[in-house]
């Protein structure tokens, strides 16, 4: 029995915890990339530069989620074939996905670079930070293929039960990013451009090492395979496209909601940007648990160990509850200190008020996001994509309607009131679909 097969052999809570923890730590260090930019820019350049970097965050997260969703979609099939020990099919999916999604990343990178000014203007970015925001975004898109490749390869690693290698690479590149941020921003005085360039270089190094290590791992599975299979690409896209939409739901919501925040001014945007970084840290914990559930479910489904799927779902809910309590305690006790970490001495009373109010509200409702992500992870692992997609679109619609209609009329507080309402509605729809489609009913998996 391969050491990578523990997801189908060990007790579900133990297996999922061992598997998910490196992914959770990886999510933290993924945010270190962006937080390092924000903290260092905020401390050494000022709150306007922080607002410029923060103004890009919602948009860059959408493109990150395209990479994550594409990887998760391919990873479901990789996990299923790995669980069934069909290594030839597994390697065909890997090769086909890497070729297809690398081409996609180049196209998206060119698109983003060319239309950076148009997109930031469309988000109603304040005029005093627009040019710096566009500069940051263009450097980001120049390195987008590196980011895309790293995220795809990271998902491939986790699909075969290996979550420690991408964590190690991410820790290395995060530390490198911090040192380069300090050198380029504080040392060379390159400002927003230096922060973006430091991130690009660190991501490129991480992607290169990931590819070499993953190539070595795949050579251990001695099976013939096709380098590109159109039918397998279609099968991958059937899961990847809804996964991209699901992964993007949160970020698309943030991007459009940011357009609601921007007219409130640069200081309100700085406070919102500071809290959004914190929200991203905790959100990605729950996203990671949901993403860990998918290969657990898919591997056990491929191995025909159906009884373990429900136990794995319950184990994920336990992990979600633990981290929701942790998020609440951290935010309630340290929200002022966390805000000052980003805003520094230049932050106004308005910036601190927006940041503190938003952060405190989120602390009460992260559990909704956790159970939503775990439920979505089971549906995705089983390939039940229709209700999965509907639930996430309802989530987005609720968040946007509350923010767009109420915030301009009644105040900025309605921006964060909309967030848990969408999470709760998403969970209710996903859970109802899951109750009807547990894998004892094999026909449900073909939805």
PLM ranges: what are they?
Residues 1-20, 78-143, 187-241, 297-364, ...:
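Short alpha-helical transmembrane segments in multi-pass integral membrane proteins
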Residues 7-44, 58-73, 77, 102-109, ...:
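N-terminal transmembrane alpha-helices
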Residues 18, 41-61, 127-132, 192-193, ...:
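Interfacial/gating helices of multi-pass transporter permease domains
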Residues 18-37, 139, 150, 173, ...:
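Transmembrane helical elements of multi-pass membrane transporters/channels
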Residues 28, 32-50, 120-127, 183-190, ...:
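Helix-terminus/linker motif at the lipid-water interface of multi-pass membrane proteins
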Residues 50-110, 147-166, 271-335, 369-383, ...:
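Small-residue-rich hydrophobic transmembrane alpha-helices
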Residues 62-65, 177-181, 206-211, 281-284, ...:
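Hydrophobic transmembrane alpha-helices of multi-pass small-molecule transporters
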Residues 71, 140-158, 166-174, 195-208, ...:
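Short runs within selected transmembrane alpha-helices of multi-pass transporters and secretion channels
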């Amino acid at each position: 029995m391969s050491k990578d097969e523990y997801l189908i052999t060990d007790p579900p809570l133990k297996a999922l915890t061992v598997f998910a923890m490196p992914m959770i730590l990886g999510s933290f260090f993924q945010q270190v990339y962006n937080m390092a930019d924000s903290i260092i820019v905020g401390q050494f350049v000022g709150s306007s530069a922080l607002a410029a970097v923060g103004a890009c965050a919602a948009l860059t997260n959408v493109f990150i989620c395209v990479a994550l969703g594409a990887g998760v979609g391919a990873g479901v099939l990789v996990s299923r074939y790995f669980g069934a020990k069909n290594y030839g099919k597994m390697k065909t999916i890997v090769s086909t996905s890497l070729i297809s999604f690398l081409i996609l990343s180049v196209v998206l990178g060119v698109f983003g670079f060319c239309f950076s000014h148009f997109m930031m203007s469309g988000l109603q970015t304040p005029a005093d930070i627009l040019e710096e925001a566009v500069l940051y975004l263009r450097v980001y898109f120049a390195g987008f293929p590196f980011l895309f490749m790293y995220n795809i390869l990271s998902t491939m690693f986790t699909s075969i039960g290996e979550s420690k290698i991408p964590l190690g690479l991410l820790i290395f590149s995060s530390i490198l990013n911090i040192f380069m941020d300090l050198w380029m921003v504080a040392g060379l005085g390159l400002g927003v451009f230096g922060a973006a360039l430091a991130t690009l270089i660190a991501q490129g190094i991480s992607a290169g090492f990931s590819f070499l290590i993953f190539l070595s791992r795949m050579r251990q599975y001695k099976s013939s395979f096709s380098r590109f299979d159109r039918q397998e690409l279609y099968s991958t896209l059937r899961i990847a496209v809804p996964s991209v939409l699901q992964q993007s739901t949160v970020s698309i919501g943030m991007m459009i909601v940011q357009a609601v925040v921007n007219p409130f001014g640069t200081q309100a945007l700085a406070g919102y940007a500071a809290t959004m970084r914190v929200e991203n840290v905790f959100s990605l914990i729950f996203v990671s648990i949901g993403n860990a559930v998918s290969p657990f479910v898919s591997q056990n489904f491929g191995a025909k160990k159906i009884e373990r799927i429900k136990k794995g779902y319950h184990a994920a809910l336990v992990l979600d509850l633990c981290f929701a309590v942790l998020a609440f305690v951290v935010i309630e006790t340290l929200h002022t200190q966390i805000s000052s970490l980003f805003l520094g001495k230049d932050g106004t009373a308005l910036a601190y008020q927006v940041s503190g109010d938003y952060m405190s509200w989120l602390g009460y409702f992260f559990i909704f996001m956790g159970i939503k992500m775990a439920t979505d992870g089971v549906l995705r692992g089983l390939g039940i994509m229709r209700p999965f997609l509907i639930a996430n679109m309802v989530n987005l619609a609720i968040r946007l309607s509350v923010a767009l209609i109420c915030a301009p009329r009644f105040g900025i507080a309605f921006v964060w009131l909309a967030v848990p309402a969408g999470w709760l509605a998403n969970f209710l729809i996903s859970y109802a679909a899951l109750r009807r489609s547990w894998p004892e009913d094999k026909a449900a998996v073909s939805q």
